[in-house]
């Protein structure tokens, strides 16, 4: 069956709670399905065996690190989906765009759009016909250069980056944009782990995690906060279950009961598969209120302080690591005072947990000599995410759990090189040392004022302060909040440019003029003037390794991201401050520039020859604190007085529910591989909302009924999505969950994290209204 037919075929929607483990036969059947429907099955089987292997390519999925152990299979179910999605033979070429107008494509689902295949030639939008038509590469570059050079101010252009971009592409991009004259780098990290970078930079002096892959083998306790690895980082399940087997505590903190955090059946263990066995992936599971994590962590710290005082009074062993505190930290007394000022009653109320649960979590933490704290979007997409992550750091500092084997901080990143892009300088608020290095090496005046993040870029386009948008990968229109306003912002631009592998909605939410520039993916062989090229990526553990494509590109018109960026830069700036076209003839020349300007990349070209790549190092992981005081900082933040934003409270409307957005299992970011969500029991549908059955009844509905969801915010904008099916689910009362990007229209552009500007997609106040169509599926 072709992918085109597969996308047109929609199974009958149904809902049946899933009772099996994560992984197992379900994962194998899913992988087989995506192989067989890729239109390239035989080649893709061989290609998959090169995933995350030396001499192969880096998985285009998540940023989880590679096991140092060798093996033929180093990919997961969702990695297989990502590879088969990219490595299809199906093409979206000039004939496709001749058949479909942009208006007709807008009526299709995101799933249908992406399953049409790979973009194979550069296209320009023709407003008269409402269609894209072919354009020569040089003409496309000239059009971009004309718009950029005609802007009154370089800050009127926005340069977006997806975490798919390689280190080489990201470095070239930031160099071009800064030579052009702006720091406007709205980046996908602004919408996910921005709070982690901000919080950790202030607390421990580095905006990355401090652990390595090997640390998981030595941890006595692993906490997993606001994360669903079974879907988003499936290869993480193996170290979690191995930790449980060796007697470590694995403590999961998530309002939803996620199957990957309960049990895992390893698809590579034949005996386990044949016996249909599985192993637990946790020793405790706590389910706080949405946004209640900081209160839970503060409660754990309050128990530690109580036990420390009891130990001192009884002349017993200390609970705190006083040697570490004295030698490495600042602000502990102020933090302990903040703990004393926080009442147990307020902690229990805001966390949504009984005091006994908080005490148990604290005892599990205190019992572990070496503790790792992991977290993801459930922590980072709240208004108070920066203080919450600093509370994680505070808790770890009390017992010296940073900078020793088996212990540390682990923000688990999403896209495969989102961390590397930031290392390369994709940052709207770049550090001075990096700008100094660029000026010294390239001899041009680097812009010093902060640029725009994602939310600021949308506001600038809405208000006419930005007129050109260039997207290096991703699906900006669908990944962002307040979707109708984002679409309006893009349509306000004089020019939008999308550098993409596959068709998505961002090509349809376009400016007055628009370009689609088809680029290579991670699986494609990249041959430039000096021969075959490798690119590099950085994972969540600061490991950098090479990636070599394995498949011949579908069209000679497709180009690599570095080649496209060099073409744009050459047309816009000429050979200033570098010869762009000479650089991309051999990517080792780009890596030499990286080595000249970014710490820890000395001898870059030699280091990537090492099997498995090389470790960048981590100052905080070595107990070197890059803070003004050269110490790690306790942050005595107060808990939010109210989790509900004043703009919601000011309406006088009492929310029916607080909703979080999330992915399905057949999804990676905005890429929809299918319409099923196996672990949650959903088949053939995405317009659903998971709600506690008691809440469904309390609100006057019945399970399976369709509703409209209306967001509450203190402005005159109606934010509504229609026809969502209510599914009864094991979720705490008062909470709800639904898939993005479908519910992104409900997230106000103004509702962002303090200090991070990340949209608060995990805390959306909503009302439910009856939908005109009352058909039920259960």
Feature locations, PLM:
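Short, solvent-exposed secondary-structure boundary/capping segments
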Residues: 730-743
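Long, low-complexity segments enriched in small/aliphatic residues
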Residues: 583-678
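Short Cys/His-rich Zn2+-coordinating modules
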Residues: 36-46
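Cofactor-pocket helix-loop regions in the catalytic cores of large enzyme subunits
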Residues: 2-28, 117-413, 438-622, 630, ...
